[in-house]
């Protein structure tokens, strides 16, 4: 089929033979996209020529990454779509075949404006198909909280239809802001895909949703589940039911019942009257555990060799290696699983790095809270943030709370197992912007083990309060709560999706959002 002039990235190329383009696999893919367009039009997802669909040609003889791409055009009535309307592209997005122009009143053929966004899903996630829907529920769900950067839901049966999720899991869909032109969304969608490795969809506020899957069946199934869940969210909102918690109780019920809340502070977020300082844990308190385990830890693990190799002779890395050697020698004496000897420097750079990588990978796998590991991770993450390969994630109630505490004159500090540098990087590069202006200081394991009472005494001495009771500590870890309480801190335990269960009769006040404080 000859090209009739297309506005996509590249002109028609000759990288695939005419015979293959006219062959059975490509023909079936064209017909499939046309059929899906008609089906989704009936669903209300692609009305008014909006929305688009693309699939990879199903040819088992060709690796998925190299398969041709079939993509629906722009400006064509989806309910009247036929196979001949489709564009066929190479795996890199180069157009190989374009539709023939039709007589007036049909518009000249034009490749979908979604093409660069579709290519991001193909290249970054190895997708087999991508669906862009303008379904009403995908727009309204993003309007319920105009400031939210994520959509969250848990304990709904249809969550099981989303890849990698179960009934009890928390579904998280990143939300990016709309732009006047579709192609202008490319960078923000790319950043969201990178920041949320478990996600198979991105919502565009007041616009729609992009959904991808390993195959057209998987993408279609997930798209149907997403639309169901977003529609359920809207209906639950109308009923005053909270879709973000396992109990699905009344929205803000806890907030309404607590007399501690102040009408002067929007959304609560006011510390107890006696508190002069708030000390926050990160993982499971300000930030989802999944972000740390699924993004931060894997990034450090996957980049430790490159980091050590490229910075081996720097003073900073020499110090990191010195601390690791001391820790590993101690681990070997104590029979710690996964510890392997580190050869002397005379053995050569490569041998030293190989042994260090093996030890670090073992430490990360065991989630050890030790200073040498945390310091090295912080230096690796710094590079990730500088390269924009990492972006900090916090729960949506956190920025509001930090701002309100700051406005009320309450000083806020962080106490985390991660290094102080890593803490600053995370809060300085969040999806909500730089939050460090609301923080007064940072504590890490150099202050002491977070499960030991002595550590909280050291924190209280550093903060200069008259009494430890003037410090409110919020954490998700029971043992940390006990240690802080034994020092005299006021303590609240954070209940977030994915956090470890608490023992029965633990005796601590719990919250699911900072808005309850």
From Swiss-Prot:
- GO cellular component terms, semicolon-separated: cytoplasm
Stated EC number for the protein is 4.2.1.109, 3.1.3.77
Catalytic reaction annotation: 5-(methylsulfanyl)-D-ribulose 1-phosphate = 5-methylsulfanyl-2,3-dioxopentyl phosphate + H2O; 5-methylsulfanyl-2,3-dioxopentyl phosphate + H2O = 1,2-dihydroxy-5-(methylsulfanyl)pent-1-en-3-one + phosphate
Query: Any idea which positions bind substrate 1?
Result: 114
List this protein's GO terms for biological process.
L-methionine salvage from methylthioadenosine
Q: In which pathway does it act?
A: Amino-acid biosynthesis; L-methionine biosynthesis via salvage pathway; L-methionine from S-methyl-5-thio-alpha-D-ribose 1-phosphate: step 2/6; Amino-acid biosynthesis; L-methionine biosynthesis via salvage pathway; L-methionine from S-methyl-5-thio-alpha-D-ribose 1-phosphate: step 3/6; Amino-acid biosynthesis; L-methionine biosynthesis via salvage pathway; L-methionine from S-methyl-5-thio-alpha-D-ribose 1-phosphate: step 4/6
Asked if the record carries the keyword Glycosyltransferase, the reply is no
Q: Know the name of this protein?
A: Probable bifunctional methylthioribulose-1-phosphate dehydratase/enolase-phosphatase E1
The top of its lineage is:
Eukaryota, Viridiplantae, Streptophyta, Embryophyta, Tracheophyta
